[in-house]
Amino acid sequence: MRIERVNESTLKFYLTYTDIEARGFKRDDLWTSRKKGEEFFWSVMEEVNQEEDFFFDGPLWIQVHAFDKGIEVVVTKSKNDDLQLPEDDSDLNIDEKVNDFINNSMHSDSELRDLLMRASEESTEQFFIVHFDDLEDVIQFSYHNYEDVDIEDLLYMYEGKYYYYVEFDDHMSEDAIHSYIAHLLEYANETQISHEQLDEYGKIVMSHNVKRQVKQYFKQ
């Protein structure tokens, strides 16, 4: 999850569908289940609050935008009634206001739901999982990867090893995928561990373009 502090009262964060699934939710849950959508939103807001000290002690205005790879959420805190809430909502508490907004915004746009459902049904994504012996191998791979492509990936820590999950969508050619994997195996080893096992027992260290993040934190 990427978080951007727009100003004192507004935050923007982006989650890939891999990020959403890593938190125990399915992408369709957000659009077809009000309860799941609310659970997901509040769990993410707790993470955001811990990282950015973004306390939500009043009315919130939430905008949710869906893209091919994930969702972007913009959260704005109402300050001095800058955000004009309907007068008949005055007796609602913050949870009810936010939940009503989420429900209305997610269920009023049928075209958006149809797009997400089709994307889920038509997806032909391939994935590959490897493990690195130590962090140094992760760093070397990140710096010597010949292609800096924008992909969905996750770096897990599980039983003292670093596991790298990479997802290729149908826009990448078979040759490009094979080349990427071949280069990856110069620094890592194949594994029989499943993505479900990593999700359940592993800890996500980095998500969404792991290589760029590694290069950001470990300068050479």
From Swiss-Prot:
* GO MF annotation terms: protein-macromolecule adaptor activity
Query: What InterPro entries does this protein map onto?
Result: MecA_C_sf, Neg-reg_MecA
- Highest rank taxon of the organism: Bacteria
Q: How does it assemble?
A: Homodimer.
Can you tell me which family this protein belongs to? Belongs to the MecA family.
Describe the function of this protein.
Enables the recognition and targeting of unfolded and aggregated proteins to the ClpC protease or to other proteins involved in proteolysis.
Domains (record comment): The N-terminal domain probably binds unfolded/aggregated proteins; the C-terminal domain interacts with ClpC.
What is the protein name for this chain?
Adapter protein MecA
Q: Which organism is it from?
A: Macrococcus caseolyticus (strain JCSC5402)
